[in-house]
Amino acid sequence: MPRLLRLSLLWLGLLLVRFSRELSDISSARKLCGRYLVKEIEKLCGHANWSQFRFEEETPFSRLIAQASEKVEAYSPYQFESPQTASPARGRGTNPVSTSWEEAVNSWEMQSLPEYKDKKGYSPLGKTREFSSSHNINVYIHENAKFQKKRRNKIKTLSNLFWGHHPQRKRRGYSEKCCLTGCTKEELSIACLPYIDFKRLKEKRSSLVTKIY
């Protein structure tokens, strides 16, 4: 019995030592510069590709443009060529591809109108993907705009919490502060907050894209 008690006390002591080390790690500031700073933030946030994350954060509408162009291309512009387009009159110089492209875009806009849907029960190109309505795209754009506004407000609030009332530190910047004076784990974890919001936006975006298709 005394032996078991000694072992349990020893195990408890080791656990307390480990816990105190972790606490000191969190509260102690470490000087991190350049790629070492990026690696530490990556380890904290668990995100592997930061260059891709920055690109998607800065251009949230790029996917929307790509999806819109895919939907127009799905209609194959050559299927909308009219007899006038196929054999243009002399001297006009009409480009059959550009004219067909305009007809494809006009057809896409018409199919998103409720009046057109009432008149036409089915699409002549049943095998192609159905187009999203303008309402769904407006919801998608509204979600992105709301995310950008929320992100700007959060960064402004976190900047005040992080730097306090030190304009010189604010000018110095996050990475320079971590390099010159050091950052604690709590301060480094601030960089994870935009990524958490970005993950939530991606979940909303995937649900919206599912509705569109």
Swiss-Prot record:
Residues 1-20 form the signal peptide. CDD domains: IlGF_relaxin_like. SMART domains: IlGF. Disulfide bonds join C33-C179, C45-C192, C178-C183. GO terms for cellular component: extracellular region. InterPro entries: Insulin-like (IPR016179), Insulin-like_pep_6 (IPR017100), Insulin-like_sf (IPR036438), Insulin_CS (IPR022353), Repro_Hormone_Insulin-like (IPR051042). PANTHER family: INSULIN-LIKE PEPTIDE INSL6, RELAXIN. This is Insulin-like peptide INSL6. It comes from Homo sapiens.
